[in-house]
Every structure is written in structure tokens, then in C-alpha cells.
Curated annotation (Swiss-Prot):
It is an enzyme of class 3 (hydrolase). It comes from Streptomyces virginiae (Streptomyces cinnamonensis). The record marks H224 as: Important for catalytic activity. SUPFAM superfamilies: Metallo-dependent hydrolases. This is Putative adenosine/adenine deaminase. PROSITE patterns: A_DEAMINASE (PS00485). Coiled coil: none annotated. It comes from the Bacteria. Its EC number is 3.5.4.-.
Length: 339
């Protein structure tokens, strides 16, 4: 029987982590106390809230909890603390590269405007990277619940700061709302500015939303993408083009996309040759971080250490990390497997 190696020592890249959702529960409680914010009971119970976002009511509840947590981030020091702690958690889980996703419009009103908010976030990322040794970059994400013109503004802003650590442009929130093609111009602006396109798709809706991300937004990565498993032709397309899917198993179960961890189609994607980068999504709400996603692959899908190492390689290759960083992480993965 193969020896089960420590998954926290497996070098990996983390490509799907939302900004507010990365917060430690203890930090949320401290910030809520600092600002006198009364949090919903679901955020103070000491265990992950029970969520099911497969209908609009469930998604509204999820969003309400997220907004409550975000309301506790009010000052630059709060931003710096969140980013530093996210980096510390990732390092603890074996990550050597983190691309954290943020919609700065959510923080701009309290941080002096959009540009100050972006600069505070980027400065926090630089500081956290220096302090922890973790390679870190930022994806700016538009909100599909807002007007496409807002997304274009964000895309231009993201391109403006591409030399300061912004590497990609995303599209998040309830994929059942709006059409991907409404945001095609924003993604064109981002791509023309050298940013990778990483919209959400194939989570709450089926394979069609993944196709829309490919056809309308020319995605180079897909946030989630698991529902592509329902369409063999789409799987082949993803595999042929080596489009990385940022798969978040614990999140998929918590939000009701799948009933059990073993129902998440990790094997289907893996055996079809679709690259995956396992991600934690929103640890604050789902109760698990990066290494736990690899543990799900091991425990519920019988991934061997050789296969887990390949998953880690796929996460690195799908990242925006520079070549030298990728080479170092890939060598570390080989050492984890053979050492």
C-alpha cells in the first residue's frame, strides 16, 4: 500500500480564493467587535454555516453572509491583516503561489475610492508576499449582477495596474443572472492589456455556461467548471485546449451543487485530461482551506499520491506565476513524490 504523504508539504498553486472569503473566522469576530457590527448568527456559531445556493433564496442568504463579513473590512489595516493572514494560511497548506480574487468596488467607498482601494490591496499583497515568502498576485473580478459598463471600467483599471501585480480578470457572483456575452467587451479590454481571462462558469448552471465563457469571453481558465463533466464534447474541448478549471470541491458540496464530496466529478475531469487547480473558494463560509481540497481528492476519489502530485503540477502550470517560480514549484512537487 502506498505511503500517504503529508499534503500540506505538497507544493501547489492556489488560483481560486476570494478576498473576503479568505478571512479567518477569528479575525471576522475581532473586526466585528471593533466596529460594533452585529453579525448573523450563522457567522458566529463556530462552525461553517449551512448553505444551499441552488435556488435564488439560497444564493441570497449566501450573499447576505458574505456582505456582512465584508462590512467589517473598513480600514487599510484591516485589508493588510486579511491579506497577510490569507498568505500565512496558504503557506501552512503548502501553497507557493496565490492568486487572490477581489472586486475593489466593494471596498472603494470606505477606502477613499476605487484607485486608493486597488493600491491598498496591491501594497498589502506586496507586503504579505515579502513577509511570508509566498508568491502572490491579484485577479480583479467584475460582478455579473452589475452593469457591463462597470465591468469595462474595472477591466481598464486592472490593465492600468498590470505592472503592479494584477494578472487576470474574472467574472463572479450568481452565474444564473445575466449573460456572459454582455461582458465580452470588458474581457476584450483585459485580454488586450495582457491579462488572463478567468470567469466563473459551470457551477450553479450546466455545461452551457462553460461554453459561454469559452465562446464569448475567450477564457483561459474557468472558475469552477465542474458542470462540464456533463458534456463529453465540452470535456474534450477543454482538454484539447488545456483550459484549467479551478475546481473547489468543498464549496461545491456546501452550496448544494453536489450532495456529497464523492459526487464532485474530479475523476471525470482528470481522466478526460482537463487540467484542474483545486481551490478553497471562500474558507470563511465553507470551513476548509487549500490542503483540504487535496484531501477530498485522496479520501473520496482515491487519488494516489502520484495523481495528487499531477493535480499540483496542473495548478502550477495553470497559474500566472513566472517561469522560474513555476520551475521551483514543479521541482518541489517531484521531490515531494520521490523524497
Amino acid at each position: 500500500m502506498e505511503h500517504a504523504r503529508d499534503l500540506t508539504l505538497l507544493p501547489k498553486a492556489h488560483l481560486h480564493l476570494h478576498f473576503t472569503g479568505s478571512m479567518r473566522p477569528s479575525t471576522l469576530l475581532e473586526l466585528a467587535d471593533k466596529y460594533g457590527v452585529r453579525l448573523p448568527d450563522a457567522l458566529t456559531a463556530g462552525e461553517p454555516p449551512k448553505l444551499r445556493a441552488t435556488d435564488e433564496r439560497g444564493w441570497f442568504r449566501f450573499q447576505r453572509l458574505y456582505d456582512a463579513a465584508r462590512s467589517c473590512l473598513r480600514e487599510p489595516d484591516d485589508i493588510r491583516r486579511l491579506v497577510r493572514e490569507a498568505a500565512e494560511e496558504d503557506v501552512r497548506d503548502g501553497s507557493g503561489w496565490l492568486e487572490i480574487q477581489v472586486d475593489p468596488t466593494s471596498y472603494a467607498p470606505l477606502l477613499g475610492g476605487m484607485i486608493p482601494a486597488v493600491e491598498i490591496i496591491l501594497d498589502a499583497v506586496d507586503a504579505a508576499s515579502r513577509e511570508t515568502g509566498l508568491g502572490m498576485r491579484v485577479l480583479i473580478a467584475a460582478n455579473r449582477m452589475k452593469h457591463p459598463l462597470d465591468a469595462r471600467t474595472l477591466a481598464r483599471l486592472a490593465v492600468r495596474y498590470a505592472d503592479r501585480g494584477i494578472v487576470g480578470f474574472g467574472l463572479s457572483n450568481d452565474e444564473r443572472r445575466g449573460m456572459a456575452r454582455d461582458f465580452d467587451r470588458a474581457f476584450a479590454i483585459a485580454r488586450e492589456g495582457g491579462l488572463l481571462a478567468a470567469p466563473h462558469g459551470g457551477e450553479l448552471t450546466g455545461p452551457s455556461s462553460v461554453r459561454d465563457c469559452l465562446d464569448d469571453l475567450h477564457a483561459s481558465r474557468i472558475g469552477h467548471g465542474v458542470r462540464a463533466a456533463e458534456d463529453p464534447r465540452l470535456l474534450k474541448r477543454l482538454a484539447d485546449r488545456q483550459i484549467t478549471c479551478e475546481v473547489c470541491p468543498a464549496s461545491n458540496v456546501a452550496l448544494g451543487v453536489y450532495e456529497r464530496p464523492e459526487d464532485v466529478p474530479l475523476r471525470t475531469l482528470f481522466e478526460a485530461g482537463v487540467p484542474m487547480a483545486l481551490g478553497a473558494d471562500d474558507p470563511l463560509l465553507f470551513g476548509s482551506r487549500l490542503a483540504a481540497q487535496y484531501e477530498i481528492a485522496r479520501r473520496h476519489h482515491a487519488f494516489t499520491d502520484t495523481e495528487l502530485a499531477e493535480l499540483a503540477r496542473q495548478s502550477v502550470r495553470g497559474s500566472a506565476a513566472p517561469d522560474d517560480v513555476q520551475a521551483k514549484l514543479l521541482a518541489g512537487i517531484d521531490h515531494w513524490l520521490t523524497g
